[in-house]
Swiss-Prot record:
Catalytically driven reaction(s): NAD(+) + ATP = ADP + NADP(+) + H(+)
Residue positions of the active site: D72 (proton acceptor)
Protein name in UniProt: NAD kinase
Organism lineage string: Bacteria, Pseudomonadati, Pseudomonadota, Gammaproteobacteria, Pseudomonadales
Group of enzyme by EC: transferase
EC number: 2.7.1.23
Amino acid sequence: MEQFRNIGIIGRLGSVQVLDTVRRLKRFLLDRHLHVILEETIAEVLPGHGLQTSSRKMLGEVCDMVIVVGGDGSLLGAARALARHNVPVLGINRGSLGFLTDIRPDELEVKCAEVLDGHYLVENRFLLQAEVRRHGEAIGQGDALNDVVLHPGKSTRMIEFEIYIDGQFVCSQKADGLIVATPTGSTAYALSAGGPIMHPKLDAIVIVPMYPHTLSGRPIVVDGNSELKIVVSKDMTIYPQVSCDGQNHFTCAPGDTITVSKKPQKLRLIHPLDHNYYEVCRTKLGWGSRLGGGGD
């Protein structure tokens, strides 16, 4: 297994709990004589830290591994910056759900020690890349680990659009919006809209209409290498928005085309050896526990 010597730390701002956990993590790593590099925004709220700092954009170039302290939203933001560097990412959960940041604060030292000793699992999670084109010219681009969402923004009106997959016309729809999600994002917004849960190892993309104006509008699961095109109706009078992971946004105009496809670079997500995806789903989604006479 890969050995890690240069460890980057990213933390969610505005949380006392996150800062406390970052301080614990910093002490733990320094006690193991590792080189610790702080992402510059978290470094600003840790005066006197005496450590090397780096921008988020460059952190992946100078680290063997990056540890994200926060919730899934924090890791989503980090993933978009780090995927292109192929640097492994480990998450310590200081949020509400923790599908991606799966180490609890109370087990920080034990689980991080296991990972640093070479006992860990690696998952390669693919991202989506989205581009909005107007009259043949790109006017907006973004990446997403969870989902790319077409929505009406501040308007309460429905959006009318056409869907194409690999150049083939699929259908036109009138709906509150459309969610294009990865397997990672299948337990996020797409799940709330009635989409299926997809195991992270699946090479697939799910297309989920948001409250479609027809009972036949259902989620579609397509090959992960598919190229999706969404064409906003020229007859629209509103300017819908495209959001990547709910964090990056750009505005569309009637007639614009949104292209969504798999990004070449993947996120290398690290888990402790005892990580169990189905246990995570059972815990986070409130699934039923084992029956008294259940199987082994």
